Each structure stands twice: as structure tokens, then as C-alpha cells.
Amino acid sequence: MEARSRIKVAAAVIVQGNKYLVTQRGYGAYKGFWEFPGGKIEAGESAEDAVVREIREELCVAIEVEKRLGTVEYEYPEFHLSMECFVCRIVSGEITLREHDGAQWLHADELNSVSFLNADVEVVKLIQGAGR
């Protein structure tokens, strides 16, 4: 049996007031699904540095990491995803979508109203469990 590829990513749970930023994927096999924005951790890069870089590249804003929320491990059919999640705030810039088809700010009780990627469903559980 062939070893499954393991992808390590960092995700930003961006908070503004009592709302969370969610983005709609604009590419790939999971196009159209919603997620917490972020991306792959590059070799030699910390997860915190990766999430700051990815958000700057994808959304054109600078963020500050407030705290680590947790790690989600999820088995997709094609790969194993290890996603480190951080609670963040935007410190400068205006959101410009460079890779996503949509973005919206949702209250915690509205997070179940969009079709999240499976791993991101687990992030919603972390948010709700943290009482954030």
C-alpha cells in the first residue's frame, strides 16, 4: 500500500467584533466550498509565519496572531491534512480576494449555514468549543 501524502497547513480564524471571516474556494477539486483562509506551511517556516504570509498573499491584509486555537487532523481521500489554526485579527489593509470566489463575516451561530470543507467543519467545532 502506498503511503498517503501529508499536507501541513496553517489556517486563520480571523475575528472582527463577534464575527468570523470565512472564504469560498475559487479553485481546485473543492471549488465552491467554504473554509477558514490559510495555506501550506513552507519548509523552514513556522505555522504562525505561514498563516501571516498566506493571508497577506491571498487577501491582501496584514494580520496579527492572537493565540493558537488547535490542530485539526483530517483524512481526505487523496491526502492527510494537518491544519494548525490560529485566532487572528486584521491590523491593516482592505480585504481583496485573490484566490477566493467569496468572503463573508459570520457570527458563531451562523457558521453552520455555509458548506464548509470537511476539515473546516472541525475548526467550527473548535471555535464553538472554545466559546469564542
Language model feature labels by segment:
Residues 36-68, 107:
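The catalytic Nudix box helix
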Residues 62, 72-94, 104, 108, ...:
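Active-site-adjacent beta-strand/loop module that shapes the phosphate/pyrophosphate-binding cleft
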Residues 1-20, 40:
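Conserved N-terminal beta-strand and adjoining loop/helix that marks the start
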Residues 29, 34, 96-132:
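Nudix hydrolase/Nudix homology domain
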Residues 4, 12-13, 26, 73, ...:
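Short secondary-structure boundary/capping segments
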